[in-house]
């Protein structure tokens, strides 16, 4: 099994979208690469902790490759916009690819390069090693499964 953490705006929609993909075996939402240990949702939303709302993904590489997974990720975000996705604004809504395995970096860079060909503006999606990931509060986990009419900036239909 492989792991990656993706940030694409509000984590509810990213998690719900990713959980529907064949080969994804686990998802959980949380706060990635900030400066405060174990922050609360309110602290992250204040913008002072530096965390991104993110989705941890465990996937079966024999079913879906990292390249395919990243192509799906690019399809649900606007990678040219800084600190905003949909109606959500703030540094916690920036787009990021956080890798856990250094061997994945070349695939990620190649994918970002290929995606750039679709845009005139530069892609601002961060590519960084995962430094920390704190699971979000339980009410955020599988939020759109528990609240099917809940807010989502991603078109899930």
Swiss-Prot record:
Protein name: Peptide methionine sulfoxide reductase MsrA
Gene it is expressed from: msrA
EC code: 1.8.4.11
One Pfam family matching this protein: PMSR
Job of this protein: Has an important function as a repair enzyme for proteins that have been inactivated by oxidation. Catalyzes the reversible oxidation-reduction of methionine sulfoxide in proteins to methionine.
Keyword annotations of the record: Oxidoreductase
Protein family (similarity comment): Belongs to the MsrA Met sulfoxide reductase family.
Database matches in HAMAP family: MsrA (MF_01401)
Record GO terms (molecular function): L-methionine-(S)-S-oxide reductase activity; peptide-methionine (S)-S-oxide reductase activity
Catalyzed chemical reaction(s): L-methionyl-[protein] + [thioredoxin]-disulfide + H2O = L-methionyl-(S)-S-oxide-[protein] + [thioredoxin]-dithiol; [thioredoxin]-disulfide + L-methionine + H2O = L-methionine (S)-S-oxide + [thioredoxin]-dithiol
Entry GO terms, CC: cytoplasm
Residues annotated as catalytic: 10
A GO BP annotation: cellular response to oxidative stress
Major enzyme class: oxidoreductase
